[in-house]
Amino acid sequence: MYHLGVPSTRALCVVMSTSDTALREWVGETLFEPCAMTCRVARSFLRVGHLELFGRRARDFGSAEARLELEQLLRHVLAREYPECLDPQDDSLRPALMRMLRPMGERMAQLMAQWWRVGFCQGNFQSDNCHLGGRTLDFGPFGFLERYNPRYCSWSGGAEHFSFRLQPKAALQNLASAIRAMDCLLDSEGREEGQQVLRDFPALLAEAFAEVRMEKLGLCFWDSDAARLCDELLQLMEASAADWTLLWRRLADVAQDWDELMEGGRLLEPLQGSFYLPLSPELEAAWSRWLLRWLTRLQGEGDCEEVAQQMRRVNPKYVPRNWMLMEAYEAAEAGNFQVAQRLQQIFASPYEEHPEDEARYFRLAPVEMRTRPGVFVMS
């Protein structure tokens, strides 16, 4: 996620035991697998759930000790995640908390837009998996979109409320929970500011999403026409069973060579291999119409080569799809770490071409992986 440009905690190392095993239950089989620990690093690992716990204690118990613990936690949040909200001349907690509310909402909105940009579905985005500093925290049942389905959820227990399209709604609920947990430490002005941030959150989301959508489409500014273009594209992608990563990346090829493609009647050619189902004549016609509208808009955006390069800087060519990761850990289990090492190199520069890896990794998900438990969806 870090190399994709998405705010995230980072992995330092993985340590595997050579003796201890744990019972893991998979679909249709029960296995003992080696135990391992992942060491992650970040400015903090503070979650909304932490704040909820101490906020509830302070609210329900009402003791000086419970209130002090909540204050200590929030001072730590400020010091580690929002030091710009501290006043060196004033150690008072209340005004610092009030100054922190809006940046917290802004970071949450930015994180949701960045997840959308790269097609990331967290799968279980409740308060225990929501970082107070606006970073990607928990990588449990996550999944990157293959076939675009806005209702996709990578966790079998997530239903639609943790789906790709509803992650911003979950973020709003988590933000509301965080603000509610601070309530007993805010005065009336601070409580009103918290409610105003919640009221403004849809606008913060709209601004963050407009920015990433504009960049993904290669546009210089966002307006109602650009919004319609993007909405129509998403509808086409869903109707056509388009691969999220492949389609966005290959649009840059259309932008770069549009004049040659149009002259040869080959406008759809760069998008071939991006769909999980054959395109009907009606969908082919719809794609052609959309591409013409989009290219007409792009002609006023600058040099074709520059537009294409800008699009490639925000539309990754490679993301850690679960079937790729499974291939790596199955090889590692057999003592071959070359696959994992190569993927690590690719994911360190996911916007680069890596032509030697295209056939293997810049492709639709293998047929046998498209519905496989533990790959397509996780428990």
Where are these regions (language model features)?
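Regulatory N- and C-terminal appendages and interdomain linkers associated
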Residues: 156, 160-379
